[in-house]
């Protein structure tokens, strides 16, 4: 699977005028004055890795069309508009999220950047005919950290239902403890900004499930775990994360 940032990033032409990673506040602020005669897209909306009706009957084609084609597109468009005059021009999306989170005082670019990333990660966390039992390595880690797969499943559902309002529920690898944990985050907050390594996420904003489930969030979450989650993808993410954790690398590619 290609790195997520590479999948989303669309470089303008000519890109050489601005360094990939701006290394000082002065350089970043100087970027604001740069203008091109042609409007360019810094990030593009990428399609889910399956047909739009492939998740039925658990998530309908109508929901995917609205969720991906309207809501996620709006986040992409809004982020591109912000970046036209932003100090974060030239950052990868993961770098942007970590920097714009600003130690818990998010800058204006943060919400749109995180939502673009969160959504792409969400689509790739699912597959047609998913669910079931994880592969051996992931299952062993789940059993070690939760006691059993059943305990993990119940904790994931409980965490999702305990979130008040909009947000996300995640399975993450805690970097320091090197253990799995289920967490939920409000609104656009991503574990990337908190130092955790995401492995699964589920969108808990109402637009993700209301057309199919109305207010029955429990059934939506249950169907995700039982029928949609891509354990194959989780295995790949875990292998990549473990390799980088073992090497002590701070910037871990997670998709």
Curated annotation (Swiss-Prot):
Its EC number is 1.15.1.1. Keywords: Chloroplast, Iron, Metal-binding, Oxidoreductase, Plastid, Transit peptide. InterPro entries: Mn/Fe_SOD, Mn/Fe_SOD_BS, Mn/Fe_SOD_C, Mn/Fe_SOD_N, Mn/Fe_SOD_N_sf, SOD_C_sf. Fe cation binds at residues 67, 119, 203, 207. Gene3D superfamilies: Fe,Mn superoxide dismutase (SOD) domain (1.10.287.990), Iron/manganese superoxide dismutase, C-terminal domain (3.55.40.20). Pfam families: Sod_Fe_C, Sod_Fe_N. GO terms for molecular function: metal ion binding; superoxide dismutase activity. Its cofactor is Fe cation. The keyword Chloroplast applies. It is found in: Plastid, Chloroplast. Its main location: plastid. Strongly expressed in the stems of the young seedlings, etiolated seedlings and embryogenic calli, but only minimally expressed in the leaves and the roots. Residues 1-32 form a transit peptide. GO terms for cellular component: chloroplast nucleoid; thylakoid. Induction: By light. Transmembrane segments: none annotated. Binds 1 Fe cation per subunit. It catalyses: 2 superoxide + 2 H(+) = H2O2 + O2. Destroys superoxide anion radicals which are normally produced within the cells and which are toxic to biological systems. Homodimer. PANTHER family: SUPEROXIDE DISMUTASE, SUPEROXIDE DISMUTASE [FE] 3, CHLOROPLASTIC. Belongs to the iron/manganese superoxide dismutase family. This is Superoxide dismutase [Fe] 2, chloroplastic. It comes from Oryza sativa subsp. japonica.
